[in-house]
Amino acid sequence: MATYLIGDVHGCYDELIALLHKVEFTPGKDTLWLTGDLVARGPGSLDVLRYVKSLGDSVRLVLGNHDLHLLAVFAGISRNKPKDRLTPLLEAPDADELLNWLRRQPLLQIDEEKKLVMAHAGITPQWDLQTAKECARDVEAVLSSDSYPFFLDAMYGDMPNNWSPELRGLGRLRFITNAFTRMRFCFPNGQLDMYSKESPEEAPAPLKPWFAIPGPVAEEYSIAFGHWASLEGKGTPEGIYALDTGCCWGGSLTCLRWEDKQYFVQPSNRHKDLGEGEAVAS
């Protein structure tokens, strides 16, 4: 029985299956953890959702910002952008079933025995684990309710960007969503910066990666996250695992086997399509 953690799939179905074959993943015996952003940019978002849903109790995933955006597109709130390559999924006969399943997935996964926490973007240093649990439940409850389109319509935006237990209503839900699915940099006090997307070496002062600011969760738990492809899986402190290595941009899909901390990598098929000198986005 092994636990495999895989970074952002982004519709790269062929690479996902190849990677799972490489590690000899066995549903029913092994468990697969996915850092979110299952969909968008890659060519196989429909196949990814169908496969992951079919795994049942053998998979533990968290929602990412692209997964939430897909739900907003399906609800008619946001525009379907051609670059996201979501049309086959949106027009599939089982789209309703898949997306109703997707919106009932969590923002946070915790394994107390392994002392392991997973969220798409990470855990803000302003939260302890109990607060993170409560905040995740707040958004999950709305997403799984009949009023979820109202939330999806209001989730876009960068404010508020500083946590307070006094936050209420849509502002509270928006902060929680941004912290779990969009966060990269913070100010020294933990306040979110929602604008900078570069590598940590290029970030303007006084911004720091969220994981470089001491927080109560990281003191007791390992944290696995995705979202930040330009990290290339590097530069995090011990116990912090950055797993998004930019498969949909021509990088790779990365898997961490938890029991022995061994990494496995599947190169992106997209590098074959990138022209010479073409930039690889992050």
Curated annotation (Swiss-Prot):
Catalytic activity: P(1),P(4)-bis(5'-adenosyl) tetraphosphate + H2O = 2 ADP + 2 H(+)
Disulfide bonds: none
The enzyme's E.C. designation: 3.6.1.41
InterPro entries reported in the protein's UniProt record: ApaH (IPR004617), Calcineurin-like_PHP_ApaH (IPR004843), Metallo-depent_PP-like (IPR029052)
Keywords attached to this entry: Hydrolase
Top EC group: hydrolase
GO MF: bis(5'-nucleosyl)-tetraphosphatase (symmetrical) activity
Function comment: Hydrolyzes diadenosine 5',5'''-P1,P4-tetraphosphate to yield ADP.
Family: Belongs to the Ap4A hydrolase family.
Assembly, per entry: Monomer.
Name of the protein this chain belongs to: Bis(5'-nucleosyl)-tetraphosphatase, symmetrical
Source organism (scientific name): Escherichia coli O157:H7
Classification lineage: Bacteria, Pseudomonadati, Pseudomonadota, Gammaproteobacteria, Enterobacterales
Protein encoded by which gene: apaH
